[in-house]
Amino acid sequence: MIDKSAVIHPSSIIEEGAVIGANVRIGPFCVIGSHVEIGEGTDIKSHVVINGHTRIGRDNQIYQFASIGEVNQDLKYRGEPTQVIIGDRNLIRESVTIHRGTTQGGNITKIGNDNLLMINTHVAHDCIIGDRCIIANNGTLGGHVTLGDYVIIGGMSAVHQFCQIGSHVMVGGCSGVAQDVPPFVIAQGNHATPYGLNIEGLKRRGFAKEDLHAIRNAYKILYRNGKTLEEAREEIAQLAADNNNQYVKIFSDFLENSAKSNRGIIR
């Protein structure tokens, strides 16, 4: 179904069954598959291929040569009808690739709202990206990677499969992230290690002084007091319970969740 207000260049191919919302613009030489849904106001430039079971929200901008919903690169994939789900107001720049999920990873690759994926970003199968994240040019997320909200991944950086990146993390350019990165932390290098807290980013987002102080205390327990990871995890959990700070609770919950994975935490 194509809304009558949509503007589609005659050279583009829209397969039967695709759903094209109101005021969508599709430029020249695009291919939109039969199981694709594109939300109202989304602007697709030119030479874009969107296929598979892909649902895209409203007011997104998708630039030339992007490929969304393509068969993933997991050798176990056997053509199951897995999905890509993209939210609203995302900016997806030239040559970005976003692959569909796998049955082993929950069937979905999911991107939230208001994200910027710069040129040549790769989002592999089963990745989950929150809101207001930025992945700079040539950034790569391996399969099953999770990004919280407000994450920044520097240019030419790669995140190993199954890693979790907490909210408000900044990963420096040309880094290789092979372990989980707790919220609010700056990570840099190959392999990436902690370089303090993303204080400037938190200030720009309006974090109060008392919240920054509480986050610093949690960071010091994890990284500067010579404790084992298990000791630090327990002490931060107690700190979260004692001071009732929402951000320390986020920090503590991340550490608890990370304990269930096999990647470990950057140290």
From Swiss-Prot:
Pfam families recorded: Acetyltransf_11 (PF13720), Hexapep (PF00132)
InterPro entries hit by this protein: Acetyltransf_C, Acetyltransf_C_sf, Hexapep, Hexapep_transf_CS, Lipid_A_LpxA, Trimer_LpxA-like_sf
Keywords: Acyltransferase, Cytoplasm, Lipid A biosynthesis, Lipid biosynthesis, Lipid metabolism, Repeat, Transferase
Catalysed reaction, written as an equation: a (3R)-hydroxyacyl-[ACP] + UDP-N-acetyl-alpha-D-glucosamine = a UDP-3-O-[(3R)-3-hydroxyacyl]-N-acetyl-alpha-D-glucosamine + holo-[ACP]
Pathway: Glycolipid biosynthesis; lipid IV(A) biosynthesis; lipid IV(A) from (3R)-3-hydroxytetradecanoyl-[acyl-carrier-protein] and UDP-N-acetyl-alpha-D-glucosamine: step 1/6
Cell location: Cytoplasm
SUPFAM superfamilies tied to this protein: Trimeric LpxA-like enzymes
A GO CC term attached to the entry: cytoplasm
SS bonds (residue pairs): none
UniProt-recorded Gene Ontology molecular function terms: acyl-[acyl-carrier-protein]-UDP-N-acetylglucosamine O-acyltransferase activity
EC number: 2.3.1.129
GO biological process terms on file: lipid A biosynthetic process
CDD domains tied to this protein: LbH_UDP-GlcNAc_AT (cd03351)
PROSITE patterns attached to this UniProt entry: HEXAPEP_TRANSFERASES (PS00101)
Similarity comment text for this entry: Belongs to the transferase hexapeptide repeat family. LpxA subfamily.
Subunit annotation: Homotrimer.
Function comment: Involved in the biosynthesis of lipid A, a phosphorylated glycolipid that anchors the lipopolysaccharide to the outer membrane of the cell.
Protein name: Acyl-[acyl-carrier-protein]--UDP-N-acetylglucosamine O-acyltransferase
Organism: Proteus mirabilis (strain HI4320)
